[in-house]
Amino acid sequence: MKKLLLIVSLVLFSIPIFAQNIYSKAYGNSKNPAIIFIHGGPSGNSNLFEGTTAEILASKGFYVIVYDRRGEGRSKDENAVMTFDESFNDLNQIYKTYNISKANILAHSFGGIAATLYTAKFPKKVSSLVLAGALFSQQETYDHILKNAPEYFKNDTSKLSQIKKIENLNKSTAEYRKGCYDIASEMNYFAMPKPTKESTALRNQYEKSIFYKTAVKNAESPIKFYKNESKNNIDTKSILREIKAEKIPIYAIYGKNDGIFSEKQLKDMQQITGKNNFKILNNCSHYLFVDQQNDFINFVSNKLKNKG
C-alpha cells in the first residue's frame, strides 16, 4: 500500500513544462528539498538521467527537476545562442516556474562548468552543489586524453596522425573538443569496464523507453557555444574554492574508471571538497547514475540530508 501511494504521489507531482521552448519536468513532492539536474553537453540532454534515476532519487524525499538547456535535447530553439548567460536566464525561470527560492544543484559532465558558474553568480539560490563526473579543468582533461592516446594507438599510424592534427588545433574550438572526446570514446574512456546485471538492466530498460527515443543531440549546439561564449575552455577550481568559502557545501562523486580525468585532477577535486564530501565509485565510468546507481543515489541522498 505504501508503495502504491508513493507511485501515485510521483505521478501527481510530475509536472511537464514547455514554456519558452524549454523542456522540464518535476518528480516528487514539491514540499521536499529541491534538486535541479544540470546535464552535460553542449549538445547533450537530461534523458538518460530522467529515464533511469530522477524518479528513484525523488522517492528518497526530494523534489527532482530535470530540464534540457535551450537549443539542446528537447528544448528546441533555432535562435538559441548557447551562452552561459542564456542558460542562467532559463535556469532562473525554472526556479520561478516551480516556485523555488533555493535548490541543490546536481551537475553532470559539462553541466559541472555551467553549474559552478551559476552558483558563483547566484549563490543565494543554491543550497549545495553536487558534482557528478563533472568537468572542472577542461584543458587538463584534453591534455590527459591526448597524452594517453599515442600509447593506446601505437600500432595505428592513421590514428596517430589524427591525434597530431587534434593537438595542433585551436584549443578554444568545437573541433578541438570533439576531436579529444572522439579519441576518448575510441579508448573506451566513457565505458563501464564490467557491466553488472543491474546496470545492464537499467540500460536495456532505458533503450526501450520514450526517453531513449527522444534523446536528441543537436550537432549545432557546440558550434554556437564556441562561437558565442568566451568561457569555452576554463578551469573552475578557484571558483569552486570561492563558493566553498561562501559556506555553500560542495560534494563530488566520480567513477574510478572515468578515463577523461587524471589522478591529479581527482586529487585536486578532493582537496577542494574535503575527503568526507568526495567519493570514488569502483567499476564505474562517466555515467555514474547508471553504472552504479545505488551507490550514486545513496551518496547524493545522504549528503543532502546531512549537509556538512
Report each predicted region and the residues it spans.
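Catalytic histidine-centered segment of alpha/beta-hydrolase-like enzymes
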Residues: 284-293
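Short beta-strand/loop motif that positions the catalytic acidic residue
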Residues: 246, 252-254
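Conserved alpha/beta-hydrolase
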Residues: 58-74
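Conserved hydrolase catalytic core segment
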Residues: 101-145
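The serine-hydrolase catalytic nucleophile loop
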Residues: 42-54
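Flexible "cap/lid" loop of the alpha/beta hydrolase fold
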Residues: 131-172
